[in-house]
């Protein structure tokens, strides 16, 4: 049982029992597990300008905030900062639509329930039959392609296995899920705005109000040059407007309020959070599928997996041969809310399945102080060719204190279901899987250049080839040793990726006969790198055992991604800090005397972590820099053997430093807790 800050309450229960036959041999056993967690999650309230915001927080017309949705520049018509527009619309500049803060769109109360049960039966003295089931349900906020509110999600997994320990096994399991009442928080903000008035109308209403009501006031400011004077001085106009910055800000607030509330035709006023109108619109949107104008997920996907393995051992020759294989089938079912299993003309949904088949074999041979291992694996996804992955490793242990290892390996990563079949609108862009390729996308930087000049020759086009499996070759060196009281383990790797899987960002742009963009749609397309991508890294960790009760530990890692072709449009989404380390001290079974008091059988641990800042690449809304941060975790514990109990009191992030761990997520602070563990 565990309780702590943020209304944390967690409890877990496990019970197991085994039975023997009349001869005293193990015959069957069963176990059940249950855990429940409840807490108030940290709220994502980052109102800093997003990495894509073209203006800062002090812009009088607003800005694009990280955790405010709907204030993005989606449709254009909101930029009046060029010299001609600045003269016709003085003080208007760039403005952003009134958005919705995430805290008004999601429930931060986290709840999670997990149940599992297993039954083991010995068919004979060596062969065991296992049946197991797992169930999970919960509600939380999750960050994936967008910020999602997961409500009443369900997970089921059932496994059947027959095995002979250290000899062979046949295993089959099925995983099923149900999205429950989950929805996309970001897309919900867009739907709320659409229910009020389209973005294009909102932008036109804003500029029209400014032109008709605010412009005369601006030109009436003392010192402001006349709009139609032949020698119009833009620098003078800018200085007058800057001197009246507070007034300009008030005019923008006035304009925003007017545009949010004044409507025509089928338009509606802004849905203000906390009102019955907002609740009604919100509930309607989050209870309908995207195809019905809502943002609710439908996901009743399934995964079926079968695997078998056989081991052949020749003890005299110190040789082991392993052969095995697996078959896996994915059956996504999202009714078009996540994948491209969309509604067809005959009112049925497109059915998607995806199957994978793999075989592997390996030899392990011990020769004195050496142990060699050679393996080969072949994988086949129904949408891609066969891929072969050989590997070899050698371990040299001249003594118990020194172990050297070297390996040359290869691996394959088949494109995921999302890489193949995703079709998901996140507002700023449509995220696409990519089995067929994509032609004539416009690079985002060239489109921005084009907008400055309306010169179509500045547009740069590129194609995206169909997605294919990612292959990696890795060489690794390692060493571990025990020097008296000091244990050290260090390793270095270098990897070469061919067809590294990431994504490309591009625009599908239609240009009118007047040279103006008539439509613009942003896409994030799953893609492979066009050149070799390399990664390398080094890690070292160790423990120093001062005595049997006290130990020090440390760990450092360095990881680096290298994209050699700078013209490649790939976005790798590596999302890994280049440097990080932690150091700590721990004690166990301690005896401490304080005056006449004696505290026995207690322990503690304190750990310091440092993580270097890094670029977090997700969806267009959630790509930005995570600043460097450090944390201290601490805990004390006490064993009470007479009660069969262990008590822990501790805190993660003890100093309560509010840090971002993902871009777009909340600032995570301290979580202090007390935990009781009872073994009956």
Task: Give, region by region, the residue ranges found by the protein language model.
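Surface-exposed extracellular loop regions of Gram-negative outer-membrane beta-barrel proteins
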Residues: 112-147, 152-156, 322-330, 335, ...
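Face-selective signature of the C-terminal outer-membrane beta-barrel domain
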Residues: 158-343, 349-384, 489
